[in-house]
From Swiss-Prot:
Residues 331-341 have a biased composition (Polar residues). Pfam families: IRS. One of its GO terms (cellular component) is neuromuscular junction. Preferentially expressed in skeletal muscle and heart. Present in thigh muscle, diaphragm and heart but not in the liver or spleen (at protein level). The lineage of its organism: Eukaryota, Metazoa, Chordata, Craniata, Vertebrata. The gene is DOK7. SMART domains: IRS, PH. Probable muscle-intrinsic activator of MUSK that plays an essential role in neuromuscular synaptogenesis. Acts in aneural activation of MUSK and subsequent acetylcholine receptor (AchR) clustering in myotubes. Induces autophosphorylation of MUSK. InterPro entries: Dok-7, Dok-7_PH, Dok-7_PTB, IRS_PTB, PH-like_dom_sf, PH_domain. SUPFAM superfamilies: PH domain-like. Residues 210-229, 249-351, 411-483 are annotated as: Disordered. Changing residue 171 to D: In CMS10; results in a significant reduction of AChR clusters. The keyword Membrane applies. This is Protein Dok-7.
Length: 504
């Protein structure tokens, strides 16, 4: 499977002693291939018609690129340097040559070249040369067309580094014939050492982030027809961009207008979901529509939230009233960058408003849901403790004594061998007196337990009766639910705060 062409266009190829103009296509056989496939057509029409290429050549072991070499009467040439050969491409303009060079370099990877001078005393021929670095391959080339005079792999080098006015490296035994120390005189020794460090560590210094392709130059010559086609293409792209922008603005207009409609709409959608869940737990299916209508009224989510929390339980302190949330207070910028956050806040407030609506339906079915009359006042102050300084101990007026402790059951129980006397007998009155004295020292709930114990422990042959209450004590004082417990707090007459009452 062949990939799309890396670069194609009109170039000049050397055929014997002449330059011939051909339509050349360069592509990779596969995305991971390290070679290039060169397809040669006579002209562009054969390429468009899908005819077979005139010739093809696979360029393997590519070591580098060298543009701008004057060769056989052409100044604008590009040499594709391989280990065994060099392909010379001629161009009519400098721009076309640079465009082909940039596109081929991008396809090959890390391709660099440096002009150096080989020092004498090594296996290499001394004199000027070109150092080519293509990925992990290092070669030295000279002459026109370029010919490789030495080759190394970066992984086979023992050491390398920049020295004053040059660069030095040493090839190990795995380099074979090219083992040894070599010194290259160059003013770019630091840059060469830096590139070696990056490539050895797997870093691409010239590549951008993954997935971002740089803008590569167009290799086609800027003729009149090409300029017209480019202008038409730019106009078409502009129209497509304007159309997309208009569609985006039309789709995002309700959410980016800056009003409360987007907030209320998102709240209504979320409240429908919350109400559908709450309607399955209650016995009033009409709460769905009523609570949804309450949540659709956007300016009152805070009051509904306060009412919903007040209905949950009386033990929870009422929360502070929240101000109505407007879009200006949220800091919403646009529908694209803050829509998610706005939607999450609105769904939270709508769920509370739907819960408040269902609670109002349960407790006040006759009131209209969401009406301001059925909701508590938003500015109600919270009760606070008394701040008055503690004075002298005030005299407490004695009231009816409330029992707090129980007496041992063995003292309260009647003997089993005696039958309970009648209500009019003196023994009964004594029992009433003892019961009144006992009730003065034990709580009312324990009195009920004591009397139930008397009934259970009575003889089987006798009739089980409860002992009568004291003359000054009513029957309700002995029941388990005698009345409301004593108030622990009272309003301070001075500051109006809550004041802790002392135990009776």
């Amino acid at each position: 499977m062949t990939e799309a062409a890396l670069v194609e266009g009109q170039v000049k190829l050397r055929d014997g002693k002449k330059w011939k103009s051909r339509w050349l296509v360069l592509r990779k056989p596969s995305p991971v291939a390290d070679c290039l496939l060169m397809l040669v057509y006579k002209d562009k029409s054969e390429r468009i018609k899908g005819l077979r290429e005139r010739s093809s050549l696979t360029l393997e072991d590519i070591c580098g690129l060298e543009p701008g070499l004057p060769y056989e009467g052409l100044v604008h040439t590009l040499a594709i340097v391989c280990l065994s050969q060099a392909i010379m491409l001629g161009f009519d303009s400098h721009e076309a040559m640079c465009a082909w060079d940039a596109r081929i370099r991008y396809a090959l990877g890390e391709v660099h070249r440096f002009h150096v001078t080989v020092a004498p005393g090594t296996k290499l021929e001394s004199g000027p040369a070109t150092l080519h670095l293509c990925n992990d391959v290092l070669v030295l080339a000279r002459d026109i067309p370029p010919a490789v005079t030495g080759q190394w792999k970066l992984s086979d080098l023992r050491r390398y580094g920049a020295v004053p006015s040059g660069f030095i490296f040493e090839g190990g035994t795995r380099c074979g014939y090219w083992a040894g120390v070599f010194f290259l005189s160059s003013a770019e020794g630091e840059q060469i050492s830096f590139l070696f460090d990056c490539i050895v560590r797997g870093i691409s210094p010239t590549k951008g982030p993954f997935g971002l392709r740089p803008v590569l130059p167009d290799p086609s010559p800027p003729g009149p027809s090409t300029v017209e086609e480019r202008v038409a293409q730019e106009a078409l792209e502009t129209l497509q961009l304007e159309k997309r922008l208009s569609l985006l603005s039309h789709a995002g207009r309700p959410g980016s207008g800056g009003d409360d409609r987007s907030l209320s709409s998102s709240s209504s959608e979320a409240s429908h979901l919350d109400v559908s869940a709450s309607s399955r737990l209650t016995a009033w299916p009409e709460q769905s529509s009523s609570s949804a209508s309450t949540s659709q009224e956007g300016p009152r989510p805070a009051a509904a939230q306060a009412a919903g929390e007040a209905m949950v339980g009386a033990s929870r302190p009422p929360p502070k009233p929240l101000r109505p949330r407007q879009l200006q207070e949220v800091g919403r910028q646009s529908s694209s960058d803050s829509g998610i956050a706005t939607g999450s806040h609105s769904s939270y407030s709508s769920s509370l408003s739907s819960y408040a609506g269902s609670s109002l339906d349960v407790w006040r079915a006759t009131d209209e849901l969401g009406s301001l009359l059925s909701l508590p006042a938003a500015g109600a102050p919270e009760p606070s403790l008394c701040t008055c300084l503690p004075g002298t101990v005030e005299y407490q007026v004695p009231t009816s004594l409330r029992a707090h402790y129980d007496t041992p059951r063995s003292l309260c129980l009647a003997p089993r061998d005696h039958s309970p006397p009648s209500q009019g007998s003196p023994g009964n009155s004594a029992a009433r007196d003892s019961g009144g004295q006992t009730s003065a020292g034990c709580p009312s709930g324990w009195l009920g337990t004591r009397r139930r114990g008397l009934v259970m422990e009575a003889p089987q042959g006798s009739e089980a009766t409860l002992p009568g209450p004291a003359p000054g004590e009513p029957w309700e004082a002995g029941g388990p639910h005698a009345g409301p417990p004593p108030a622990f707090f009272s309003a301070c007459p001075v500051c109006g705060g809550l004041k802790v009452n002392p135990p009776p």
